[in-house]
A protein has these predicted regions:
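Primarily marks secretory-pathway-exposed extracellular/lumenal segments that are disulfide-
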Residues: 1-13
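GH16 jelly-roll
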Residues: 14-231
Length: 231
């Protein structure tokens, strides 16, 4: 996973070969343990299953480093009243950014009921609670549809309770068997999504206010593997 600050203007939608960045943060997971100067671990099941009806209990012990790769393992085991455990880790107050390029190389599980995600949430919800301060989903995958991978945004206008974000997509049948690079390039005007350098969609700032574009604040990275939901 890595993030870069922008050094020149983005002149076209996503994946532009003339785009230059300076690396400001990365984690190559090349140590023996996860670097807690970069990552926080969220625990428990949140409110109402993290708002989604998820079935797992998050804990740090389900994340490890193997052969230079981060592994998040969902387990079918009883723990604190739940039948599954997994990990949710994030960079809040250790890695927070406004604008730039954020990317990670990921391989997702193929088991039904799994819901891995690589996404961004606001460090400070200056426009109010979810969805008003925004959410940026760089990669989501549902194990019941192994050939589909999704990227999208959420805000006051576009959220699960109304509206369809224009950046949703489905592709990549090899998502569960190979690593792919999932990226968002974020400027004050555009969120541009790509997979392996291939542009797949953009969401644009229409200058109509934070209801449509709350993406002018700092966000942080989340990596997690959920089990089940009410979606």
């Amino acid at each position: 996973a890595g993030t870069c600050d922008q050094e020149c203007e983005n002149s076209s939608g996503g994946g532009d070969d003339n785009q230059y960045y300076t690396l400001v943060w990365s984690d190559e997971f090349d140590g023996d343990t996860i670097d807690e100067s970069k990552w926080n671990f969220e625990t428990g099941n949140g409110n109402w299953g993290w708002g989604n009806g998820e079935h797992q209990y998050y804990r740090q012990q389900n994340a490890s480093i193997e052969d230079g790769k981060l592994v998040i393992e969902a387990r079918n085991e009883s723990f604190n009243g739940f039948d599954y455990t997994s990990t949710r880790m994030q960079t809040r107050n250790k890695g927070d950014w406004r604008y730039g390029k954020i990317t990670a190389s990921l391989k997702v599980p193929s088991a039904g009921g799994t819901w891995p995600a690589f996404w961004l949430m606001p460090t400070n919800s200056v426009y109010g609670g979810w969805p008003h301060s925004g959410e940026i989903d760089i990669m989501e995958h549902y194990g019941c549809n192994p050939g589909d991978v999704h990227a999208t945004v959420h805000n006051t206008i576009f959220n699960w309770n109304g509206g369809t974000p224009p950046t949703s997509y489905s592709m990549y049948t090899s998502a569960t068997s190979e690593f792919h690079e999932y990226t968002v390039e974020w400027t004050e005007d555009e969120l541009s999504f790509s997979v392996d350098g291939n542009w797949i969609g953009s969401y644009y700032n229409e200058n109509s206010g934070p209801e449509q574009w709350p993406y002018d604040q700092e966000f942080y990275i989340i990596l997690n593997l959920a089990i089940g939901s009410h979606f």
